Amino acid sequence: MIKLNAKKIGLICLASALLVQLVTAVSLLSYSYRTKAYAEKNGRIINLACLAYDPYSPFKGRYIRLSFEEETISSKNLDKESFQNPKKHGEHYYFRMEEGADSLWTVRGIRKDLPKKESEQAGENAKGQAKSIYIKGKTYPYMLYASASETIHATFPFSEYYMQENYARYVDTIKWEDFNALKPVLSLYVDKNGQCIQKGLTVLSGSQRVSIEEYCKEKIKGVKAQ
């Protein structure tokens, strides 16, 4: 029988933990690559208008916390199919998104289940992009046969946007109202199951829309030049 001392056992446990982390990281990278490729090939990239999450402390650590206009939904803008099933508090649902003339996407329907056929999920518009795309999220609070005057609250799992440390520190110096005045937009890759991966966060810089990273880079460069 092979006897292992405490040091060897510790090394084995450490190696096992590192292996699990490595496998997890590779799996996530593989999923991200496949989702990006699928979304680009099938025109499944959407843009959501967003704001700083907390007017007093909108940024924390190395990420920007965001809220989205589409988290507050007027039921009068939803299709009839949205109200066929009782909606329970905090459960996952699929939100049918449509693109507007401003290239921003809005919620036009809510489903308990994702349509089984991809052809039922989305057709194509003149640009070759999907007319409707479903994304996964939750509804708060109850949404049981809401009337047209009611507001539905939703939450989505992509509200934290991570940044490099130096950019995050600069963003932390921006007042929330000034940040929101930049009209931030979060772009997402969407897979066929409604799961989303962040493509990037953009803001207005003059009349041009640029990535938040590029915006911070130029602002930091300007401060250093003074």
Show where each model-derived region lies.
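Short nucleic-acid-contacting surface segments enriched for D/E, G, S/T with interspersed K/R
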Residues: 59, 82-93, 173-185
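Alpha-helical transmembrane signal-anchor/signal-peptide segments
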Residues: 32-50
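Hydrophobic membrane-insertion alpha-helices, especially the h-region
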Residues: 11-31
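A mature extracytoplasmic/lumenal domain signature
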Residues: 52, 62, 70, 99-101, ...
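Structured domain cores in non-transmembrane regions
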Residues: 72-145
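Short extracytoplasmic
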Residues: 45-78
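Extracytoplasmic/periplasmic terminal helices and flexible tails
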Residues: 106-109, 127-226
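N-terminal positive-inside, membrane-proximal cytosolic segments immediately preceding the first
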Residues: 1-13
